[in-house]
Curated annotation (Swiss-Prot):
Presence of the UniProt keyword Cytoplasm in the record: yes
Binding site for L-methionine: 56, 99, 239, 270
Catalytic activity: L-methionine + ATP + H2O = S-adenosyl-L-methionine + phosphate + diphosphate
Organism: Serratia proteamaculans (strain 568)
Binding site for K(+): 43
Molecular function terms, GO-annotated: ATP binding; magnesium ion binding; methionine adenosyltransferase activity
Main location: cytoplasm
An individual GO BP term: one-carbon metabolic process
Quaternary structure, from the entry: Homotetramer; dimer of dimers.
Subcellular location(s) per record: Cytoplasm
Name assigned to this protein: S-adenosylmethionine synthase
Length: 384
């Protein structure tokens, strides 16, 4: 492979689509705290002065959706109408129904191991050894830029920052290896009382320099900081937001394929979410075991059926053992039936609000990021 560029983007927790994701997952967490067996499909729409929460929820729990919504928006940082959105005064509308009994009968089983998939679909998981968290570098550093933006906004270092922001990083590769960063884009919402020059200098010093490794930066690296010149109107006032609209930001930044299903607001019986997490877990353990430098897993399901309809392992020519053997190891060491993967990763717990900003993968404290199967895989493969 010759020299090439690859770009990934991220968005902050204050981006309208991410506000929606976080509200959906905050509702999910509140329900799972009381009722781990709940069926939740919670969608959120945000626009100036309004939040609409809808979907299908079947549960014995009672949660205050309005209060959860306001608390989530408040924690993100929208607390004044000057920002274009105010947690304290926005309207919160709810349109919640129950899960269809036709779906329910295919998912629930007397024997939990026979729990069927909540829908048909295909999911992908990916890992690469180009970063310490076994994630692609472009999306990893795009996330870290907007995480840093939120950090210096909330701790008062740059008090004129506002919650909405986007980042984009272009990496240069030579023969599949990173040789540098070609371009960095960071657009951040701000208050009226900061000049573009002061903003650009502060963002460079307080956000970009602390995050990006100096060995990848050069005199040729291009920086675009608030390139439109002004970003005062942002958040839901600038754009409406919707749950599930940032599926590439949520996953691998375009470096791996995507089955199309979004994550936020869905309980773990929805394989769109849980099987994508499981596929990441499998791929990461294969790479951590040294069985491949890059690994992509595809898994697919039929609604109401427990066993996956297919499992595929792709290693892009980096495998250390035959891919047929890798596929056999995946089937031996990972239970990818819906109930099996829920148990394997302990998914029936309220951990989802935190996943809804800055990427679902590459943050080590989530259970699907564990590499506890790596040694077993390596031994079984016969590698020393």
């Amino acid at each position: 492979m010759a020299k090439h560029l690859f770009t990934s983007e991220s968005v902050s927790e204050g981006h309208p689509d991410k506000i929606a994701d976080q509200i959906s997952d905050a509702v999910l967490d509140a329900i799972l705290e009381q009722d781990p067996k709940a069926r939740v499909a919670c969608e959120t729409y945000v626009k100036t002065g309004m939040v609409l929460v809808g979907g299908e929820i079947t549960t014995s729990a009672w949660v205050d959706i309005e209060e959860i919504t306001r608390k989530t928006v408040r924690e993100i940082g929208y607390v004044h109408s000057d920002m274009g959105f105010d947690a304290n005064s926005c309207a919160v509308l709810s349109a919640i129904g129950k899960q269809s009994p036709d779906i329910n009968q295919g998912v629930d089983r007397t024997d939990p191991l026979e729990q069927g998939a909540g829908d048909q679909g295909l999911m992908f998981g990916y890992a690469t050894n180009e970063t310490e968290v076994l994630m692609p570098a472009p999306v990893t550093y795009a996330h870290r830029l907007v995480q840093r933006q939120a950090e210096v906004r909330k701790n008062g270092t740059l008090p004129w920052l506002r919650p909405d922001a986007k980042s984009q990083v272009t990496f240069q590769y030579d023969d599949g290896k990173i040789v540098g960063i070609d371009a960095v884009v960071l657009s951040t919402q701000h208050s009226e009382d900061i000049s573009l020059k002061d903003l650009q200098e502060a963002v460079m010093e307080e956000i970009i320099k602390p995050v990006l490794p100096t060995e990848w930066l050069s005199a040729g690296t291009k920086y675009h900081i608030n390139p439109t010149g002004r970003f005062v109107i942002g958040g839901p006032m600038g754009d409406c937001g919707l749950t599930g609209r940032k599926i590439i930001v949520d996953t691998y930044g375009g470096m791996a394929r995507h089955g199309g299903g979004a994550f936020s607001g869905k309980d773990p019986s929805k394989v769109d979410r849980s099987a994508a997490y499981a596929a990441r877990y499998v791929a990461k353990n294969i790479v951590a075991a040294g069985l491949a430098d890059r690994c992509e897993i595809q898994v697919s399901y039929a609604i109401g059926v427990a066993e996956p309809t297919s499992i595929m392992v792709e290693t892009f020519g980096t495998e250390k053992i035959p891919t047929e053997q890798l596929t056999l190891l995946v089937r031996e060491f990972f239970d990818l039936r819906p109930y099996g993967l829920i148990q394997m990763m302990d998914l029936l717990q309220p951990i989802y609000r935190e996943t809804a900003a800055y990427g679902h993968f590459g943050r080590e404290h989530f259970p699907w990021e564990a590499t506890d199967k790596a040694a077993l895989l390596r031994d079984a493969a016969g590698l020393k």
